[in-house]
Regions:
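Short, flexible loop motifs at catalytic/binding sites
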Residues: 1-259
Length: 259
């Protein structure tokens, strides 16, 4: 059993006014500490802060509605806010992972599904070496909404965790890793993009071995055969090695045939 770190809110990464210099002795221990919180979570008093929530609130970025100096509503690219939505969804994802189960998330618009989906995939790709982190959906426009968020969000991570792009094709595959001065490409993780094409491409996820898997907007077509084709890739002697997340929007469920 892992002994969780205890942390006060003032010590969260987002509350730090000074980040150690890259050349300082503090730099590695500082980011190793926050990496541990992103991987294992922490206790804040008697409250458990799950690892995805800590990552999401401290290191991910998205467009947040704000009021500017003239009283107008505008958007700022910054850390997400903590609402009930983020609390409930990330805790359920954490529980699904601990129980080696999948999770279905259905909700209205503005629930933060796309933001959390993008954060979840980036979280896996940033820390899980040799992992395949898969975004699947029923059509290209919905998939692109998520991949655009990941593409931008990865660029705003701390330099300590910001991988280079060895492959950078957001329609098929992005490989994170290191490019050496000698031209060698050393992969760390993959983000795979798969289009189920309203259920017509049932083998889209087959043959992969996902550590993170999202199937987005499941109400917009038949997804079940595509999901079933993916299951052997994350089935192990110890249970599911991946907790697949299936999401849908309440107003877009008319074509949902797999319930």
């Amino acid at each position: 059993m892992i002994q969780l770190q205890s942390i006060d809110y003032k010590d969260w990464f987002l509350n730090q006014s000074r980040i150690p210099d890259k050349e300082s002795a503090e730099y590695k221990p500082f980011f190793n500490f926050h990496k541990e919180l992103c991987l294992n979570g922490a206790m804040m008093g008697s409250v458990y802060i799950n690892p995805l929530l800590y990552w999401h609130l401290n290191f991910w970025n998205t467009e947040v509605d704000v009021i500017d100096e003239r009283g107008r509503i505008s958007q700022k690219y910054s850390n997400p806010l903590l609402r009930d939505n983020e609390w409930v969804i990330t805790n359920e994802i954490d529980r699904a992972q601990q129980e080696k189960k999948g999770l279905v998330i259905l909700g209205i618009r503005r629930l933060a599904k796309s933001v959390i989906e993008s954060s979840y995939i980036a979280w896996g790709a940033t820390f899980d070496e040799n992992s395949q982190n898969i975004i699947a959906g029923l059509n290209a426009p919905d998939i692109k909404l998520i991949t655009d968020k990941i593409d931008k969000g990865l660029n705003f991570l701390p330099e300590a965790w910001r991988w280079q792009r060895i492959e950078d094709n957001w329609k098929n595959q992005v490989t994170l890793g290191i490019k050496t001065k000698g031209g060698e490409r050393i992969p760390f993780s993959q983000i795979l993009i798969r289009n189920l094409d309203e259920g017509n491409n049932e083998e889209a996820i087959a043959g992969t071995k996902p550590r993170k898997l999202i199937i987005d907007e499941i109400g917009k077509g038949s997804f079940l055969r595509g999901f079933q084709a993916a299951v052997p890739g994350f089935t192990t002697p110890y249970g599911w090695g991946c907790s697949p997340i299936l999401t849908g929007t309440g107003g877009d469920m008319k074509r949902f045939m797999d319930a």
